[in-house]
């Protein structure tokens, strides 16, 4: 009996490890026309979520079912996009890039699986190429690598200026984009299941508050990414903080602390190689002490300002790539979280309904069942029958109907 149970278990593990090998019916690349995304000649809306952990869990074949569950639950609710990490740098468990130019093949196959499974189930991916923060390596790891090779660096923001570090980043871009998926046999740069790349998660450069250093880096790296991969859309990974190019917005919309981070929402997105604008709305992080009414008022001003600027100045789509309300926020209630989701979605829908620049919203964050080790204050399990999940599903339904109406 024990032997039979072991054989059955082994068969399940093997089956799970090969989920996603069969490709779904062919699907096109997401492109853009003015302020709208286009898929197979029709308008496309980015309704989705963040799940940074996908490649990490997919590195172990016995836990790949978690990726399958999340994608299946997402599509059952009408969600279309998952935003996830395409990096994990340094001497950490399940690192992707263990040293400059050195990659762990098992971890890379985890990312292969995520892409293959997204393709099979019908999810588009937005993949980030490095982190601003120290988590999972980030720009600090790149700077440490350079220092170990004798480079004179004084801060983590030398990531943007040091030529050796910039070459490390470019090599990572080439390695990831040219990677041939071991499941689908398709190079990432040729894979339609990938919607877009983002240069960095939440780029900031505090040592140069003028914004010039970060702007120079984007001006160099965005065309470089496009030279390697002209098929996919590209954005910055920006939080949406305004800079010196729009002083009125900077003074009226930015959290005060954001005025020193060297980012510029308008300038950083106003180049040809950047296809769409990115913003986040971390009202729970930026304004811990706001009451609910004040929080919702800020969200309205923040989103409507960026949507207006994407429409009239950038003339590109804008994605709200992170939003939510953490349970660790002072005076948190589920009703308050639902209020944040409802207000956010209503503003996105109002723009999309008019053919405006708001192309979708991705909440932070989704986890799968049984992932208590990854659970955070903002984690949502899509299979839960919570009021928040109902709001997510209803918004996806409305945006889907809007897309169908627009296509006629």
UniProtKB/Swiss-Prot annotation:
Pfam families: Cellulase (PF00150)
Reaction(s) catalysed by this chain's protein: Random hydrolysis of (1->4)-beta-D-mannosidic linkages in mannans, galactomannans and glucomannans
Residues listed as glycosylation sites in the UniProt record: 73
GO process annotations (BP): polysaccharide catabolic process
Entries under Gene3D superfamilies matching the protein: Glycosidases
Subcellular localization(s) per the UniProt record: Secreted
Sorted UniProt keywords: Glycoprotein, Glycosidase, Hydrolase, Secreted, Signal
Membership in a protein family: Belongs to the glycosyl hydrolase 5 (cellulase A) family.
Residues annotated for substrate binding in this entry: 85, 201, 364
GO MF: mannan endo-1,4-beta-mannosidase activity
Major localisation: secreted
EC number: 3.2.1.78
Name of the featured protein: Putative mannan endo-1,4-beta-mannosidase 4
Catalytic residues in the record: 202 (proton donor), 322 (nucleophile)
GO cellular component: extracellular region
InterPro entries: Glyco_hydro_5 (IPR001547), Glycoside_hydrolase_SF (IPR017853), MAN-like (IPR045053)
The organism's place on the tree of life at top rank: Eukaryota
Organism: Arabidopsis thaliana (Mouse-ear cress)
Signal peptide: 1-23
């Amino acid at each position: 009996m024990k032997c039979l149970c072991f054989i059955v278990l082994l068969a399940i593990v093997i089956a799970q490890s090969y989920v996603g090998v069969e490709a779904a019916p062919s699907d096109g690349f997401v492109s853009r026309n003015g302020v709208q995304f286009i898929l197979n000649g029709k308008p496309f809306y980015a309704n989705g979520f963040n799940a940074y952990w996908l490649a990490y869990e997919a590195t172990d074949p016995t836990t790949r079912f978690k990726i399958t569950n999340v994608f299946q639950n997402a599509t059952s609710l009408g969600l279309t996009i998952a935003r996830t990490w395409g990096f994990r740098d340094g001497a950490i468990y399940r690192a992707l890039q263990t040293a400059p130019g050195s990659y762990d093949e098992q971890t890379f196959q985890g990312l292969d699986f995520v892409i293959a499974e997204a393709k099979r189930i019908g999810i588009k991916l937005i993949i980030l190429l490095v982190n601003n923060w120290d988590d999972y390596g980030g720009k600090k790891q790149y700077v440490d690598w350079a220092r170990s090779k004798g480079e004179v660096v004084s801060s983590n923001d030398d990531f943007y200026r040091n030529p050796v570090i910039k070459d490390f980043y470019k090599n990572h871009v080439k390695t990831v984009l040219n990677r041939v998926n071991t499941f689908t046999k398709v190079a990432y740069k040729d894979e339609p299941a990938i919607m877009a790349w983002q240069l960095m998660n939440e780029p900031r450069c505090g040592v140069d508050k003028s914004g010039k250093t970060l702007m120079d880096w984007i001006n160099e790296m965005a065309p470089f990414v496009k030279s390697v991969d002209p098929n996919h859309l590209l954005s910055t990974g920006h939080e949406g903080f305004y800079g010196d190019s729009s002083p009125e917005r900077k003074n009226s919309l930015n959290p005060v602390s954001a005025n020193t981070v060297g980012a510029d929402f308008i300038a950083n997105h106003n180049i040809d190689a950047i296809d769409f604008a990115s913003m986040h709305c971390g009202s729970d992080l930026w304004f811990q002490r706001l009451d609910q009414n004040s929080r919702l008022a800020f969200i309205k001003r923040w989103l409507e300002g960026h949507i207006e600027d994407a429409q009239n100045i950038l003339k590109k789509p804008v994605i709200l790539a992170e939003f939510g309300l953490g349970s660790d926020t002072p005076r948190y209630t589920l009703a308050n979280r639902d209020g944040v989701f409802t207000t956010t979605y209503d503003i996105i829908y109002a723009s999309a309904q008019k053919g405006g620049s708001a192309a979708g919203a991705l909440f932070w964050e989704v986890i799968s069942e049984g992932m208590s080790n990854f659970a955070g204050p903002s984690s949502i399990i899509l299979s839960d029958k919570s009021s928040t999940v109902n709001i997510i599903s209803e918004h996806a339904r409305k945006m889907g109907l809007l897309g169908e109406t627009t296509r006629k």
